[in-house]
Amino acid sequence: MTTYFKLVKGATKIKSAPPKQKYLDPILLGTSNEEDFYEIVKGLDSRINDTAWTIVYKSLLVVHLMIREGSKDVALRYYSRNLEFFDIENIRGSNGSASGDMRALDRYDNYLKVRCREFGKIKKDYVRDGYRTLKLNSGNYGSSRNKQHSINIALDHVESLEVQIQALIKNKYTQYDLSNELIIFGFKLLIQDLLALYNALNEGIITLLESFFELSHHNAERTLDLYKTFVDLTEHVVRYLKSGKTAGLKIPVIKHITTKLVRSLEEHLIEDDKTHNTFVPVDSSQGSAGAVVAKSTAQERLEQIREQKRILEAQLKNEQVAISPALTTVTAAQSYNPFGTDSSMHTNIPMAVANQTQQIANNPFVSQTQPQVMNTPTAHTEPANLNVPEYAAVQHTVNFNPVQDAGVSAQQTGYYSINNHLTPTFTGAGFGGYSVSQDTTAASNQQVSHSQTGSNNPFALHNAATIATGNPAHENVLNNPFSRPNFDEQNTNMPLQQQIISNPFQNQTYNQQQFQQQKMPLSSINSVMTTPTSMQGSMNIPQRFDKMEFQAHYTQNHLQQQQQQQQQQQQQQQQQPQQGYYVPATAGANPVTNITGTVQPQNFPFYPQQQPQPEQSQTQQPVLGNQYANNLNLIDM
């Protein structure tokens, strides 16, 4: 057993899968050598006579690939002289021809047989040579004798192309047939052959129609018959290619000459049957005059056909240009938009932030209407022309993009950009709170002022609030977290929407978070008041704190609490039992400079050394109650 016979056997295994490339490549290379080619042919002869459907079908696939990709015209020349290779009688006798697989095998075998037979007639493979060879055969006529010979060759080649296409389009498959991998592999090869053959046929028809009025009457009738067949084949080819698209194959759009010349050509032939002036050689003067008239009419029709050819060639060259104007129009429409945004200014900003900033900053009507945040999930607004409290128009925005480029500053587009009387001033407290200007009560009946979008500096808001008050001491009041003269009044008249901002655990906008991160120390963020762990179960007090109540009571009762805590700690050291609990830290001498000493709890339990007396355990509970009675002021009930 030779090497090529083994390769053929491996390429035509009974397995229902396309031939592997490791077998096909050596076989295709072997077609360039005559001895190797004959060994391949012997191996295929033994496999084509097998009774297994997969082996026979894969043998035909190998022959098809040798015709398409092997040495040029080697396989076609051999099988055109040995058409008996395609007589697959053994498998027909064993399996019959009723099944769908057998019908597909017969149609595929017949197409390859027709392909080889037509090559024996015209000695031309238009799948590999292309349609340009057909154009050259009829282009340069030379003498009239050569002209007629070239036209006859063109007629023969066009007729052969139509026969091959008719045999090819008979290989129709259903969706069930295309589920077979072998049939899909062969179907792809058929589609590629059909595109090449149809392009060659289209060029041949154009060549014949250009010379239609210069042909003999017999050749003109033959050309008309070929043109009618071409019109019918065009419809079938289009349907066949559509079936390839449904199978998931990439099918290009085919271009062909018009199919509406049948009637005009028939009328011309009928007229010539009556006059006998169009295709008859002219010898007399009378005939010459009649020929001039007839020639002028024929020339007009010839020019029409040539115009059809020029249109077709323009369509083939400008196939992609037909799609590009739509894209150019869309690009031109998008190049200038007076109401759009400038993309060059926001190349490094995320889409949501850029849209939100540009819709407010570039809108000329934003100063006349209530500002709205387009991309925020929740927004609570009030009309600007109503007499409502100054905090009723608070917008709560949630920014889902906490990361922003360092080179782009954040612009105030929320409520603080249009309300000067409510400024997010940092208080310095451990809860990240913000103070409220004292001039808010005086501006309660004022409407919302124009939006301020000129400044991107978050510190400019603090300066604007300081200048607006006109009081030099007001800046100190804002910077002092313990100076709250009118806090209780403002807190009682404050609506629920504004109190949401006072919640230290409430989500803040990105501008407030950026301002807080620049000025708030890390130690003050982590300082949170907690109750002793031993008292949480009995007191049933929720662990929620309000920074405003803490600051108000702290400024009023701080000194009293300091004295009481010192006395209570002395009593605790004498009367406290062995049970350990956390003791709040003693406040420093200066309540302003030593804030963290009164806010942070001790991190270790306290165990007194003295043993308590049995009779003193009954008096311990009121002492503990007095001890934490004052500390309850620090907890939001």
UniProtKB/Swiss-Prot annotation:
Gene3D superfamilies: 1.25.40.90, ANTH domain. InterPro entries: ANTH_dom, ANTH_dom_sf, AP180-like, ENTH, ENTH_VHS. GO terms for biological process: clathrin coat assembly; clathrin-dependent endocytosis; endocytosis; vesicle budding from membrane. Residues 623-637 have a biased composition (Polar residues). Residues 587-637 are annotated as: Clathrin-binding. It is found in: Bud; Bud neck; Cell membrane; Cytoplasm. Its main location: other. Keywords: Cell membrane, Cytoplasm, Endocytosis, Membrane. Residues 1-126 form the ENTH domain. Residues 555-637 are annotated as: Disordered. GO terms for cellular component: cellular bud neck; clathrin-coated pit; clathrin-coated vesicle; plasma membrane; prospore membrane. One of its GO terms (molecular function) is 1-phosphatidylinositol binding. The keyword Membrane applies. It is a peripheral membrane protein. It comes from the Eukaryota. Residues 560-579, 600-622 have a biased composition (Low complexity). The keyword Membrane applies. Pfam families: ANTH. CDD domains: ANTH_N_YAP180 (cd16988). Interacts with PAN1 and the clathrin heavy and light chains CHC1 and CLC1. Present with 623 molecules/cell in log phase SD medium. Belongs to the AP180 family. Involved in endocytosis and clathrin cage assembly. This is Clathrin coat assembly protein AP180A.
